[in-house]
Amino acid sequence: MKKREGRRRRKKMGIRKLTAIYVAVVAICACAAGGGIWWAFWLNDRTSQTAQLETATTEETEEPQIQEELAETEAESETETETEEPEVYVELTEENRAHFVQVESCEIQPGSGTFTLKASVEEKPASDDDNFYLLEMNMYDTELNQDAESIATVPKDKEFSLQAGVNENQTDSRLYSKFVVAVKLDGEYVPLCDPQYITNPEALAAYQGAFPSQESIKGILVDPMKLTGGELDDLGVHHAAYNIPISNILGETTNGNYPTIYYTYNGITYAFNGQRIAEYDHVFSILTQKGITITAILLNNKSAAQPQLIHPLSRDGSAYYYAFNTAEDAGIETMAAVGAFLAQRYRDGEHGTVMNWIVGNEVNVRSDWNYMQYVDLETYAREYANAVRVFYNSIKSMNANARVYVSMDQQWDRNLSSKNSYDVKDMLAEINRIVSAEGNIDWGLAHHPYAYPLDNTTFWNSSGKIRSLITASENTSIVTMENIQVVTDYLQRPEMLTAEGEVRPVILSELGYSSLDGEVNQAAAFAYAYYAADSNPYIDAMILSRQTDAAEEVAQGLALGLSTQSGRRKFIYDVFKNIDQPGAETYTEFAKSIIGINSWSEVIASR
């Protein structure tokens, strides 16, 4: 205001000076013209009096105006002070800092080579400066490394975004890293949210082929010796499962006819056994040509040549398969390379197309199928969830619409004192909690609802203690095909849905019934199971184990195949072949009397 007043005053003083000069000039001219000195003095005196009078008059009229403007300025200043709210900063405490920032998304921006983490806060946190920082962590880190450098910075705001490079297929790739938003407090980084992973690796995929649609849920665990004999065509198979023990495909080839395949991923070159890969090429290409949707099961078998794949807490035991190693860089890097290699090779038809990938086998059974020293449920579930995320990101970054599944058996909610296994219900809840908190991804469930016990082919006749274990309650101890709806009902709970609000994909990737209790009973059990699965809209496939009896299983009392080892087709063969065809009732009518029903609706719930 003072500057504005000064400019106004200088302007009026200039006018007065010009007036005085003008009068003086007139006077001098008049004196010169009249030739009288007295006249000049008189005019000069009158000019001085006029100037003094103007000055006095101006000051008298100007003073009220100045006072008025000062009053207006003070009023404006007071109004501005009243309307401007002071910035409020919230002090960070141990209680509020863990979830101070709410993360909306952490996603790759297609075609940009970058990812963006979007987040918000209710109020700005107090800290050393006015910035939010994005920091990178390893998958196995449990706390922030204070020596880390921020990879992105943004001024504090209630809604903000942080952007950094994905560094795709580079030594410093961030596809398997997790990220936190932090502030500096007393010179140290303080994380303000749960670690977050990139959730849309499919944005990197060159292959965007749609997931295949099938007319039937019918599938089989295939016998590789029967791929070319026409049996799969005769059976009308729509889905097939095949195992891939990972250590078997790694390492250089010893057979010169099948050269080693070298594959560089994230700056590291890996050797894949050319002969083993050729075998999978053969299987997957034939199945693809037949229009069959393929499910590959990634198994972590132990090999002295590939110790990095075995979790540090799993190296002391003996089991069929072991927990994947997400606790060390070498394990994560190898898993990621395997996932990327397989998904890239089996995506576009040249070597076959695999669209379903299962991570491990019945991983809730810690002692046999996913060995790790006993740990609490949260620790165990986190290690497995991390393995699923590594394969999810590596596979979907190569094949955008591939699906990745967790694998569970039928022990739903047993609450056993034994430490050999964890309940499936508890495992699913914990995996979901961990994954949702750190960046929800679209994992699916590959379930194994075998009869209980496994050799109980006529499961509908169960009684006593066994019957009490199998109920329609969500707290049932065991899930079989009698109560499979318990699983899909559970997955419909709001907290279990995908980020898009969808029910997660479900496949019954392994179940079967032994013919040692009678081939007709085996066929009746299959018919029951198939109709139960087919009536459930959330089940995408039912894969029967198996096409041919396995010697090691028969020795345990489980002859699960459609055919014997000698090649003789069992009674179940024609039932399997025709159950999804017109006139199927002709082949399944026999089962009603065996089960003791007049209509399938008596045992198959309407969904």
What are these regions (language model features)?
Residues 172-191:
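Short, aromatic- and glycine-rich surface loops/edge beta-strands on solvent-exposed regions
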Residues 238-416, 452, 549-557:
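Substrate-binding cleft and catalytic face of glycoside hydrolase catalytic domains
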Residues 1-79, 83:
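Gram-positive cell-envelope targeting signals
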Residues 123, 165-167, 192-248, 253-254:
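Boundary/entry segment of secreted carbohydrate-active catalytic domains
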Residues 229, 335-338, 350-355, 379-520:
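Noncatalytic carbohydrate-binding groove/subsite architecture in carbohydrate-active enzymes
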Residues 85-111:
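Short, compositionally biased P/S/T/A/G/V-rich stretches that sit at domain boundaries
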Residues 111-126:
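Aromatic/hydrophobic beta-strand junction motif of beta-rich domains
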Residues 258-260, 317-318, 347, 368, ...:
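Aromatic-rich peripheral "rim/lid" segments of glycoside hydrolase catalytic domains that contact
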